[in-house]
């Protein structure tokens, strides 16, 4: 069970790295092969972060554990791949944007009253508070954009490394 949770959390990190910087050479072939086994193109993060996530992780994990015997290599790769699918799903770095969201406004934590002589009473802020407005809606177009091969592979490696540490 713990392995599955870590694998899913790691899989959620598939889409932000845009280069192979920091990915150990021992991992490259395993990752490339796992992406193909999962049925995705190396540059297709929509596939890697979606329907093929479990298949890619299942294919890459035993290979990486065998090929990368240095724990430091696994840890380094995990830090590089961290956050990739989350970033992809949030629309970061050439990723497909997420659909629009309408969030209700948060209530003020306490009422405020004007202060005499332009001072700010304790417990209030001079700058506007970061609360949402119920009348505001953020709309973002949906779609996908090609990603470079390194970004997809780095994210998958981060997933597999996290899974390995959970064992």
Curated annotation (Swiss-Prot):
Q: Which GO terms label this protein's molecular function in UniProt?
A: metal ion binding
Question: Which one GO biological process term can you cite for this protein?
Answer: biological process involved in interaction with host
Membrane topology label: Lipid-anchor; GPI-anchor
Identify the gene encoding this protein: CFEM8
Location in or out of the cell: Cell membrane; Secreted; Host nucleus; Host cell membrane
Q: What this chain does, per the record?
A: Appears to function during host infection, and may play a role in suppressing the host immune response.
Q: Which residues form the propeptide?
A: 144-167
Main site of residence?
membrane
Q: Spell out the InterPro entries in the cross-references.
A: Extracellular_membr_CFEM_dom (IPR008427)
Q: Which family does it belong to?
A: Belongs to the RBT5 family.
Q: Which domain of life is it from?
A: Eukaryota
Q: Tell me where in this chain the CFEM domain is found.
A: 18-112
- Can the keyword Glycosyltransferase be found in this entry's annotation? no
Q: Give the disulfide map.
A: 26-68, 30-63, 40-47, 49-85
Residue positions annotated to bind heme are: 44
Signal peptide residue numbers: 1-17
According to the record, what induces this protein's expression? Induced during infection of poplar leaves, with highest expression observed four days post inoculation.
Glycan attachment points: 117, 135
Name the UniProt key words of this record, in alphabetical order.
Answer: Cell membrane, Disulfide bond, Glycoprotein, GPI-anchor, Heme, Host cell membrane, Host membrane, Host nucleus, Iron, Lipoprotein, Membrane, Metal-binding, Secreted, Signal, Virulence
What is this protein called in UniProt?
A: Effector CFEM8
Choose one Gene Ontology CC annotation of this protein and give it. extracellular space
Domain note: The CFEM domain is involved in heme-binding and contains 8 cysteines and is found in proteins from several pathogenic fungi, including both human and plant pathogens. The CFEM domain adopts a novel helical-basket fold that consists of six alpha-helices, and is uniquely stabilized by four disulfide bonds formed by its 8 signature cysteines.
Q: Does the keyword Protease apply?
A: no
Identify where the record puts lipid attachment of type GPI-anchor amidated glycine: 143
């Amino acid at each position: 069970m713990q392995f599955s949770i870590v694998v899913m959390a790691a899989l959620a990190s598939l889409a932000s790295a845009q280069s192979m910087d920091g990915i150990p050479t021992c991992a490259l072939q395993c990752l490339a092969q796992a992406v193909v086994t999962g049925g995705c193109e190396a540059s297709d993060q929509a596939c890697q972060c979606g329907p093929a996530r479990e298949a890619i992780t299942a294919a890459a994990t035993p290979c990486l554990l065998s090929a990368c015997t240095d724990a430091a290599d696994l840890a380094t790769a995990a830090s590089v791949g961290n956050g990739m699918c989350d970033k992809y799903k949030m629309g970061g770095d050439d990723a497909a944007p997420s659909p629009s969201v309408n969030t209700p406004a948060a209530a003020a934590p306490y009422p405020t009253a004007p202060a005499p002589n332009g001072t700010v009473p304790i417990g209030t802020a001079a700058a506007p508070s970061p609360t949402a407005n119920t009348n505001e809606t953020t709309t973002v177009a949906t779609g996908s954009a090609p990603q470079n091969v390194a970004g997809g592979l780095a994210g998958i490696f981060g997933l597999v490394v996290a899974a390995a540490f959970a064992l």
